[in-house]
Amino acid sequence: MASNHQHKDWLELRRDDETGIESVNAHFQGHAYDPHDHDEMLVGVTQQGLQRFHCHRSLHTSRPGRAMLIEPGAVHDGHAPQAEGFTYAMLYLPQRWVSDAMSRRGLGDASVLEGAFHSTLTDDPMLATAIHQAFFALHQGE
């Protein structure tokens, strides 16, 4: 899907045919999305602005450089608390791909990952950098 950066909200979606991983780069002002969940594991980074969302019955506020970690089935919403909105990069990791990757590396059954994220947001700069690098590699088709 191509983006249209002339409007206040925009979204670029790419899907890697080999892995099934989807990469989303998006910008929203005001209300972004209603409560929903995904079958995939989500890992992403806020790139610009403040991103506010409910997840796990808590209100979270992400700022540039923070990594977001959302398990499959975790209901979340989203909005921009500031007029300039927010921009983020997100990878949607299919559970089957995660399971296969863990198995290939001898890390056991992916079911151990159920609810595995200790925090929905983290300030770990190495993790945020790794997510960003993986995002750009997939999103740009490298």
Where on the chain are the PLM-derived regions?
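Amphipathic alpha-helical segments enriched in hydrophobic/aromatic residues interleaved with Lys/Arg
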Residues: 105-142
